[in-house]
Amino acid sequence: MIPQEKSAAVTRGLNETFGVTEFEDIRDLTERPGSNRAFRIIVRGSAYLLRINTRPGDMTRHFTCMQAAADAGLAPRVRYASAEERISITDFVEAVPLLAPDALVRIPSALRTLHALPSFPGAPFNTTCTFLLNKGPALDGFLQKFRASSILPENETEELLARYQQVAAVYSRLDSDLAPGHNDLFKPDNILFDGNRLWLVDWEAAFQNDRYADLAVVANMIVTNESEEWIYLQEYFGEPPDEYQRARFYLMRQLAHMFYAVAFLTLGSSGKPIDRSEPVPVYSDFQRRFWAREVSLADNQAKTVYGRVHWEQLSQNMRQARFDEALRIVSDRNAIQKGTRTLLPSVP
């Protein structure tokens, strides 16, 4: 079950960590072909997670961030980690369902602790919604490819890109909002609850990022109205959020919708126009099922549905008064800070 080429390295890890050369039991938890390998192993009667990273790239940042999170009580205890061998052994979390009302308090509390840690290393590539704020050839190519693909009708694509330009024009990258980020919390499987404590797992995408990125992607799964938003943000900030914090949070939630709509529509459709005849699930219902692990994004059809769900929700949000109000609030704060008002691009 262990890849043959990693057998010796796993044996060394077991020996260094537990003084044994084999485990008592093993269960393969690998999600799908091409994924990092994951196994539940039993050693001396206790369960651990053995992870073998198969994706290319330096593991140093991943393991550094994972260890920092574990030291802070946010991630399971790290028993063994070898960046050279790309292997880690951590405590295994026997997860139970975390209901959304409980998550509204537990998750922002955990994120507050995470974002207060010493700075994380940078990453070679941004795989989060803040990628849309990184001007340069990579972003230009990403957007040009989407526009040229005609995945969505031209008028819808242009509306999305126009609104995106408005957000990008006013959403300044503030040093005060940069914080250690997990950056992969749109996947519910990376948020585990053992019945007593919350654990954040899989730190492969961790790096220093805008604090609102983590907050937004989780909120897009579990925050369904303004009352829940207040609970969520008050738990994070430790006090009622002001209008500027709520505006930045709201705009980041829209950036997340944009990012996942474009990314997953592109992945799921292989860059071709999508079939619009199939009905789209109601956003809140879909995210409720996604949060409950009832929906998998493994195949292209599921990816397309996920992208469409985000696009439909974004389409509704773009026409709400709060969208323009959030743009105004953030733009006005920029004017105070810079001494001049940021002009918003107009929507055609």
Question: PLM features: residue spans?
Answer:
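Active-site activation/catalytic loop segments of kinase-like enzymes and analogous catalytic loops
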Residues: 212-244, 254-273, 286-297, 302-306, ...
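ATP-binding pocket architecture of kinase catalytic cores
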Residues: 28-159, 175
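Conserved NTP-binding catalytic cores of kinases and kinase-like/nucleotidyltransferase enzymes
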Residues: 1-81, 86, 169, 174-179, ...
